[in-house]
């Protein structure tokens, strides 16, 4: 799943550490989310969206995989 987390975080002038602290997660979690190595739980996705005042869909972009 793609996301705009890094773009949104930087636009707000936040460091990964600051966002992680606000969401009660590790900086490594934020880094992994931004790099697309980790998909958030639904609870974390809601927390991120609420923190930024956006919808989940404005941050996370779901793309269906094409079947072979």
Q: What positions do the PLM features span?
A:
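A short, Lys/Arg-rich alpha-helix, primarily the initiator
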Residues: 1-11
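DNA major-groove recognition helix of helix-turn-helix/homeodomain DNA-binding modules
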Residues: 43-58
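Short, charged recognition helix plus adjacent turn
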Residues: 60-68
């Amino acid at each position: 799943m793609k996301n705009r987390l890094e773009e949104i975080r930087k636009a707000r002038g936040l460091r990964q550490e600051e966002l992680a602290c606000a969401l009660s997660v590790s900086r490594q979690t934020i880094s992994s989310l931004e790099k697309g190595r980790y998909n958030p739980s639904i609870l974390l996705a809601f927390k991120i969206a609420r923190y930024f005042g956006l919808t989940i869909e404005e941050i996370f972009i779901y793309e269906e995989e094409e079947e072979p």
